From Swiss-Prot:
<feature type="transmembrane region" description="Helical">
    <location>
        <begin position="3"/>
        <end position="23"/>
    </location>
</feature>
<keyword id="KW-0472">Membrane</keyword>
<keyword id="KW-1003">Cell membrane</keyword>
<dbReference type="GO" id="GO:0005886">
    <property type="term" value="C:plasma membrane"/>
</dbReference>
<comment type="similarity">
    <text>Belongs to the UPF0370 family.</text>
</comment>
<feature type="region of interest" description="Disordered">
    <location>
        <begin position="36"/>
        <end position="62"/>
    </location>
</feature>
<keyword id="KW-1133">Transmembrane helix</keyword>
<dbReference type="Pfam" id="PF13980">
    <property type="entry name" value="UPF0370"/>
</dbReference>
<protein>
    <recommendedName>
        <fullName>UPF0370 protein plu2724</fullName>
    </recommendedName>
</protein>
<dbReference type="InterPro" id="IPR020910">
    <property type="entry name" value="UPF0370"/>
</dbReference>
<keyword id="KW-0812">Transmembrane</keyword>
Amino acid sequence: MQWLADYWWIILILLVGVLLNAIKELRRLDVKKFLDNKPELPPHRDLNSKWDDEDDWPQKKP
């Protein structure tokens, strides 16, 4: 861990560089254009919405 104490500033510069590049890329992202061209999501392959069609809850007696 001696190298970490000696070269902490290089790690800090790398982290700042990564952070700045991430901010630059996020600023380039056009959310409205993405939402306009967003692809339709395919249905799930396991069809969870169709495997249990019957009603399992007990019926209320009036």
